[in-house]
Amino acid sequence: MTGVQTCALPILWQVFVNHLPPTILINIYSTLIGVPIGLALGIIAALKKNKWQDQVINIFIILLISVPSIVLALMIQYVFCFKLGWFPLTMSTSDDYFTWEVFRSMLPAVFALCLGSIAGYARYTRAELSEVLTGEFMLLARTKGLTKKQAIYRHAMRNSMVVIFPSILSEFISVLSGSLIIEKMFGINGVGGLYLNSITFQDYDFFMLLSGF
């Protein structure tokens, strides 16, 4: 597509729907990969607080937060796609999105998107779990005869996850809105390309439709 000029709304909607699946998929994949890794790193850092594991994870988080996401995306593209050749530079053009070829071609963009989620959830989980572990009810659980491991898994983990899990939906929505540049960089034929084209070709009707999304 090279641009959509002002036309009937049904046509605009059909073009939008046709380009929606790649955008949805890369964001679902990035959430499914980024959230568990971030939670795991945060849990390890909290349980090993002030030990070498915690320090290594904190350095990793600081690097991910400090380096601009576009730089990380360029590094992923250069190292894994260009130098090592593990992944194609652009997404496969196949219409069947649920094949290994298409999934493999999406992975560089997925990794670029999920790095921010990993850093955010690791930091958030570490903070929440560390606070819970020092709470009075943990001492009470130990006095009732629970071992340290039992107190952590039955009480600390449960209470910290109650706060963390509601943010997963908002995380998905925020990543969905921030995948525009990533789609363009990795040749993902999704909504991001349409959005940029609507600006380039001054198609205001289409721009308003995409902005609503």
Positions of PLM-derived features:
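Alpha-helical transmembrane segments of integral membrane proteins
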Residues: L20-Q53, S69, F98-F213
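Short, small-residue-biased leader/transition segments that mark boundaries at the very start
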Residues: T2-L9
